[in-house]
Curated annotation (Swiss-Prot):
Upper taxonomic lineage: Eukaryota, Viridiplantae, Streptophyta, Embryophyta, Tracheophyta
PANTHER family: MATURASE K
GO biological process terms, semicolon-separated: mRNA processing; RNA splicing; tRNA processing
GO cellular component, one term: chloroplast
Protein's recorded name: Maturase K
Keywords tagged on the record: Chloroplast, mRNA processing, Plastid, RNA-binding, tRNA processing
Keyword Phosphoprotein recorded: no
Subcellular location: Plastid, Chloroplast
Protein source organism: Amaranthus greggii
Xref: Pfam families: Intron_maturas2, MatK_N
Family note: Belongs to the intron maturase 2 family. MatK subfamily.
UniProt key word tRNA processing: yes
Length: 505
C-alpha cells in the first residue's frame, strides 16, 4: 500500500491548488457552450490571473433575464413557471458546465507538459475507437477466456469528491462540487444510460462524464501497477500439481518470493497473455489461462474495488465466458470467435486424401434488433422495421431532408464498415432510404413510386459513402473488386466518438 500511495502522490506533484477564481472568468462559460474554440486559447487565458466579480454578476443577470417558460411537459416538478425552482436549476446547470471546463484544465496542462521535449507525432488513428477492433482480431484468436465486466460506480457521492481531492486541493472548488453532485442526485442515469451503446444514444453531461472518467482512470492506474507485480500465489508443497498442462510452458515465468510477514516462500506464476480493453463503462479482460485463473481474477476485481475505493460490485456484473462459444456485446457490435472449416485435397504419389483445416476467425456482426429499435424510437420505422415517414421533417426543404437522411445513412455505413456480415447493414440503409422517400412524398402529397421515378438514381447517390461513390465511378457494377469492397471489412481510424444521430435536427 505504501508503494501505491507513493505512486499516486508522485503523479499528482504537479497539481494546482487554486482554481476557484476561474469561476469568475467570462471566457470559461463561453468555452463551455462553444466547443469549436481552441482549447489552447483557454489554457493560455487560464494562466493569466485576471478575475472580475462584475463579470459573474452580469452573467447571473443575463441568465435570469432569459425565457424560463420553455419547460418539459412530462416533468411535473418543473411546472412552477412563476417560481424560483426552474431559475435555480438553470443557474446550476450553466455554472456546472463552466465548472467542468475548470476541472479539466489541470489534466490538459499535465498532458501538454508530458508531451514537451518528446518527439510524438499526433495521430488521430491512436484515438480512434475503431482501432480497438484490429487489436481484438489480432489477439483474441489466441486466447481462451474473457471477463466481461461492467465497471461499478460509487453508491455514495462523497467518493467522487475524495477522488478529485487527490488531484485538486482547492477546498472552495470541492465544496462547490459537492453542491452540484447533491443537486443532481440522479447522476448514475446520466453517466450510465440503461439503453445499450448505439449511435442514437444521448450525450451525457460534461461534468459527470469527466468525474466518471476520472474515477475509471483511478481504477486503471492502480490496476496497471498491481498488474506489473501480479501473479498467482502457489504453495511450495503443491507447486508441482498446479496447472500441470501448462506447467512446462510457464516454467520460465516461475519466480521465488519470500514473504516477510509469514516467513514462508511462495511461488508466483506471471501471466504473459493478459489483454485489457475498455470503452465507456464496459471492459474486457482476456487471457490464455484456465477458467480457474479467470475466477481468481473475478474475485480479485471485486476485492480490489471494495478495499481501495469502497465501491461494492456484485459478482453478477462480471461474467466469465469461453471465447469459442460466446458473443461479446461491445461498442455496438456483436463479436465472437468462430471456427471456419476448409477442406484441402492433398496427393502423395498415387494416394490422395482430404485434410480438414480448422481456422479461427474473429467476426463482428451488426446488431440488427437494437438498431431497428433505435430507428423506431427516432420515428424512422415502426417496431417491426417497416419504414414510415418522418413527419417532423416535412416542413424542411427537399435538399435538407435528403441531406439529413443521407448523413445518418453514411455515418452508419462508416461506423459499421468493419462488419463481417453486411446484410443487416443493407436492411438499415433500406429503411432510411424508404423513410426518406415516404417523407418527401408525404410533403408533396404524392406516392413513393412516382417520387422515386421522378428522381431516379440521383436520389440513391445521397446515401452512398465517399468510398462507394469513387469505386462506383471507376469500376463497373459487376466488378469483382467492387463486390469485394461491399463484402469486405474496413476499419476507419478517424472515428473518435459515436455521434448522436437521432436528434440531429
Amino acid at each position: 500500500m505504501e508503494k501505491l500511495q507513493g505512486h499516486r502522490e508522485l503523479d499528482r506533484s504537479w497539481q494546482h491548488n487554486f482554481f476557484y477564481p476561474l469561476i469568475f472568468q467570462e471566457y470559461i462559460y463561453v468555452f463551455a457552450y462553444d466547443h469549436a474554440l481552441n482549447k489552447l486559447i483557454l489554457l493560455e487565458n487560464a494562466i493569466a490571473k485576471k478575475s472580475s466579480l462584475l463579470i459573474v454578476k452580469r452573467l447571473i443577470t443575463r441568465m435570469y433575464q432569459q425565457n424560463h417558460f420553455i419547460l418539459s411537459v412530462n416533468d411535473s416538478n418543473q411546472n412552477e413557471i412563476f417560481g424560483h425552482k426552474h431559475k435555480k436549476n438553470l443557474y446550476s446547470q450553466m455554472i456546472t458546465e463552466g465548472f467542468a471546463v475548470i476541472v479539466e484544465i489541470p489534466f490538459s496542462l499535465l498532458l501538454i507538459s508530458s508531451l514537451e521535449g518528446k518527439e510524438i507525432v499526433e495521430s488521430q488513428n491512436l484515438r480512434s475507437i475503431h482501432s480497438i477492433f484490429p487489436f481484438l482480431e489480432d489477439k483474441f484468436l489466441h486466447l481462451n477466456y474473457v471477463l466481461d465486466i461492467l465497471i461499478p460506480y460509487p453508491a455514495h457521492l462523497e467518493i467522487l469528491v475524495q477522488t478529485l481531492r487527490y488531484w485538486l486541493k482547492d477546498a472552495s472548488s470541492l465544496h462547490l462540487l459537492r453542491y452540484f453532485l447533491y443537486e443532481y442526485r440522479n447522476w448514475n442515469s446520466l453517466i450510465r444510460p440503461k439503453e445499450s451503446i448505439s449511435p442514437f444514444s444521448k450525450r451525457n453531461r460534461r461534468l459527470f462524464l469527466f468525474l466518471y472518467n476520472l474515477l475509471v482512470y483511478e481504477y486503471e492506474s492502480l490496476f496497471v501497477i498491481l498488474r506489473k507485480q501480479s501473479s498467482y500465489l502457489r504453495s511450495t508443497s503443491f507447486g508441482a500439481l498446479l496447472e500441470r498442462i501448462h506447467f512446462y510452458g510457464k516454467l520460465k515465468y516461475l519466480v521465488k518470493v519470500k514473504v516477510k510477514v509469514f516467513g514462508v516462500i511462495l511461488w508466483l506464476f506471471k501471466e504473459p497473455f493478459l489483454h485489457y480493453v475498455r470503452y465507456q463503462g464496459k471492459c474486457l479482460l482476456a487471457s490464455k489461462g484456465t477458467s480457474f485463473l479467470m475466477y481468481k481474477w473475478k474475485y480479485y476485481f471485486i476485492a480490489f474495488w471494495q478495499c481501495h475505493f469502497s465501491v461494492w460490485s456484485q459478482p453478477r456484473r462480471i461474467y466469465i465466458n469461453q471465447l469459442s462459444n460466446y458473443s461479446l456485446d461491445f461498442m455496438g457490435f456483436i463479436s465472437n470467435v468462430g471456427l471456419n472449416s476448409s477442406v484441402i485435397r492433398s496427393q502423395m504419389l498415387e494416394n490422395s486424401f482430404l485434410v480438414d483445416n480448422i481456422i479461427k476467425k474473429f467476426d463482428t456482426i451488426v446488431p440488427i434488433i437494437p438498431l431497428v429499435g433505435s430507428l423506431a424510437k427516432a420515428k424512422f420505422c415502426n417496431g417491426l422495421g417497416h419504414p414510415i415517414s418522418k413527419s417532423v421533417w416535412t416542413d424542411l426543404s427537399d435538399a435538407d431532408i435528403i441531406d439529413r437522411f443521407g448523413r445518418i445513412c453514411r455515418n452508419l455505413s462508416h461506423y459499421y464498415s468493419g462488419s463481417s456480415r453486411k446484410k443487416s447493414l443493407y436492411r438499415i440503409k433500406y429503411i432510411l432510404r424508404l423513410s426518406c422517400a415516404r417523407t418527401l412524398s408525404r410533403k408533396h402529397k404524392s406516392t413513393v413510386r412516382a417520387f422515386l421515378k421522378r428522381l431516379g438514381s440521383e436520389f440513391l447517390e445521397e446515401f452512398f459513402t465517399e468510398e462507394e461513390k469513387v469505386l462506383s465511378l471507376i469500376l463497373p457494377r459487376d466488378s469483382s473488386t467492387l463486390s469485394g469492397f461491399y463484402r469486405g471489412r474496413v476499419w476507419y481510424l478517424d472515428i473518435i466518438c459515436i455521434h448522436n444521430l437521432a436528434n440531429d435536427e
